[in-house]
A protein has these predicted regions:
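Non-TPR docking regions that flank or precede TPR/alpha-solenoid scaffolds in eukaryotic proteins
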Residues: 1-677
């Protein structure tokens, strides 16, 4: 078993990271931060000054104090530091169910003490129930804080060791047993940012369970768990149906959905699952009425409105798609709980010899000074949660009908600034004092104005755009709409009119007010399209003149993200490849991996996968669910023998190939389809 090196962050003498973690307990909202491991070291040949070092961990076995003490004991010997010795260690693991920080103190040599600390800093005794909860939270954090291969999560928090919490069927039984025992308390853990109110089937526990089943392909285990839970509460049917669909048992899924909806006709998770399934089969006509009923059953949830918008997009009812998008309730994005640590005295990031390879060296990354200001100002890359999903839907419409047609539809359904002024002048001339029906908006309950901070991308009504936003290409700048002004009392959103074929938007009275956040999205999309058009035009001109089109690696990375946001996969792959030709980039390699998946290029997929896995190991991550899923699907489709042969034939050092063989070994341990061959 190849393991990563151990990062060391040296704490400043004036601050204790353990005390700061204790102070931050009361501000934790959901699953909590990664585990903290704090060691005290002193020189081997003297009893001189002691120094505190720490790192973070996800995925370690937190089922008992003994397992955490065992982890600390693995850190006693360090091949990178032979002048100091470890005298004590403290392992802190957050229990999100009971809002306690479980701690194990190990004296070396000496005793082991376990206890827990509450939000007030009081020291309490740890019970068996506490350890069960802590173990489950630890597994869920391992999946929640895992990197998708792009390196974004790894770069966000320095010095985190990531382990796979479930490496065999025995560990799986332990995990699923804990999940079954604590399932009905799962709503206490919170939920993904797209969910307004965590409930029995939409929370971090159910998300983690579905993620585990999808990653490992252990559909039978997931079905068995949810079938048992469904006997206690029929609401679990939506989760069971999703696992049936994942496991290619669609007939059972359809039968289950039919029975469950007869029992609970207004259960929105069931309706959403059914609508999603109908959409995947190209039956938008069936999905439409289901999605409408889902909106009625949960009008304050973003997911139901987003699904209805997807249905309208698939039916090419662009006006209804925009009106539905305008009605989406938007939520302020709440990021995952992360460590809030003081500035360290210094940081030591040793590299394991098994993960060292010149080809994946990204240490020569260039700085921001080589990135054009216009590229750095693109704010769409910062969208998260509901705003990211809404932007994705808007860009999907743009890809299918074009920017000009989108602006035309927008002006047909929303009140534009120019016509509002004209209408207001007419009203003043007629001395009309009654409120016009045209100012009644299709309102969202959210009053959040998630205005992107980039100055050059978004303008409020009446503002003058900066010179950098002036058009120098063929992308027309959108006119401003009249936006709905947020108020303290906002009515619940109402579904758009049900019969779009007979709607006429030519009259001012039939139009809607555009929510401010959606108006902002149009302006951000305009800036994305403007930069994209300039890039493609310049690239074509250079190509026609047989000249090299030069950008820095960071610029190619940004352009790849831009094309990906705009649903231009071929252009994105071109940018990723140009970036990788200059230096290794995990984000670029993850983009190329997606391109190889799309093209069905098995050798290309495995080549990208080997390099990504090695880069992950280099930065202390032994586990990425996304990469496990990719290699599992390859083994399922091509067979384990072929996959192993292609890996072994790759012209990279053997110790690098062994890291990928270790990932493939997980599939054999779980007896995944294709691993027997």
């Amino acid at each position: 078993m190849i393991q990563t090196a151990v990062p060391e962050i040296f704490e400043d003498d004036s601050t204790s990271v353990v005390e700061i973690r204790t102070e931050n307990l009361q501000s934790l909202r959901e699953l909590g931060p990664p585990d903290l491991v704090h060691l005290v070291k002193q020189p081997v040949k003297s009893t001189g000054k002691q120094v505190g070092v720490y790192h973070h961990v996800t995925g370690a076995d937190a089922s008992s104090s003994a397992s955490l003490a065992a982890y600390i004991n693995t850190l006693v010997y360090s091949p990178h530091d032979k002048t100091n010795k470890v005298t004590s260690g403290l392992y802190c693991c957050y229990n999100a169910f009971s809002r306690l920080d479980m701690r194990v103190q190990v004296q070396i040599p000496g005793t082991v003490e376990s206890y827990c600390v509450n939000e007030r800093g009081d020291k309490l005794e740890a019970s068996e129930e506490h350890w069960l909860e802590t173990y489950l939270c630890s597994v869920l954090r391992a999946y929640s804080y895992a990197d998708d291969g792009s390196g974004d999560t790894i770069k966000k928090i320095v010095g985190v060791r990531r382990f796979n919490p479930i490496t065999n069927t025995e560990a799986e039984h332990k995990f699923l047993d804990a999940a079954e025992r604590l399932f009905f308390a799962g709503w206490q853990l919170g939920s993904d940012p797209e969910i307004q109110v965590p409930n029995l089937v939409s929370n971090h526990l159910t998300t983690g369970l579905l993620n585990y089943v999808r990653t490992t392909g252990r559909y039978a285990s997931g079905i068995n768990l949810f079938e048992k839970l469904r006997t206690r509460d029929p609401e679990i049917s939506s989760l069971l149906a999703r696992v049936y669909i994942m496991g290619d048992e669609e007939v059972k899924a359809v039968q289950l959905l039919r029975e469950a909806i007869h029992t609970m006709p207004m259960d929105y998770p069931l309706l959403d699952c059914q609508a999603e399934y109908c959409l995947s089969k190209g039956r938008s006509d069936l999905a439409l009425e289901i999605a409408k009923r889902s909106v009625i059953s949960a009008p304050s949830e973003f997911a139901t409105w987003a699904r209805l918008a997807e249905v309208y997009i698939s039916m090419e009812q662009w006006d209804m798609a925009l009106l539905t998008l305008n009605s989406c309730p938007m939520f302020t994005y709440q990021d995952k709980d992360s460590p809030r640590m003081p500035e360290p005295a210094r940081v030591s990031l040793p590299l394991a010899p098994e993960a060292m390879c010149d080809e994946i060296d990204d240490s020569n990354t260039v700085g921001e000074e080589l990135v054009h200001p216009n590229l750095r100002r693109l704010s769409a890359a910062n969208y998260k949660g509901t705003f990211q999903k809404a932007y994705s839907l808007l860009t999907e419409v743009t890809k299918r009908i074009g920017w000009d047609h989108l602006l035309k539809i927008r002006s047909q359904v929303f009140v534009m600034e120019e016509e509002y002024r004209h209408e207001r002048q007419a009203v003043v001339q007629q001395e009309a004092h009654s409120r016009s029906a045209s100012t009644t908006a299709l309102r969202s309950p959210a009053t959040t104005d998630d205005r992107p901070s980039t100055a050059g991308s978004v303008f409020t009504n009446g503002d003058t755009p900066p010179a950098s936003a002036a058009l120098g290409d063929d992308v027309p700048k959108p006119q401003h709409t009249i936006t709905a002004v947020p108020s303290m009392e906002t009515p619940d959103p109402q579904p758009p009119a049900a019969d779009p074929q007979h709607l006429q938007y030519t009259q001012f009275q039939h139009k809607r007010l555009c929510e401010r956040w959606l108006d902002n999205l149009f302006m951000v999309l305009y800036e994305d399209l403007r930069i994209y058009t300039i890039w493609r035009t310049e690239a074509q001109q250079y190509k026609s003149q047989q000249l090299a089109y030069k950008k820095s690696a960071d610029e190619w990375e940004i352009l790849g993200e831009l094309a990906d946001r705009l649903h231009r996969p071929d252009d994105a792959a071109e940018a990723w490849e140009a970036c990788l030709n200059m230096r290794f980039s995990p984000k670029g390699m993850r983009g190329i991996l997606s391109a190889y998946e799309r093209y069905g290029d098995v050798r290309g997929e495995l080549g990208a996968l080997i390099r990504l896995i090695a880069w992950q190991y280099k930065w202390y991550s032994e586990f990425s669910p996304s990469l496990v899923h990719v290699i599992r699907k390859l083994i399922e489709e091509e067979g384990a023998v072929k996959v192993r042969s292609i890996i072994q034939a790759t012209s990279l050092p053997q110790h690098i190939l062994d890291l990928t063989h270790q990932y493939a070994g997980l599939c054999a341990a779980f007896r995944s389809s294709g691993s027997e061959a």
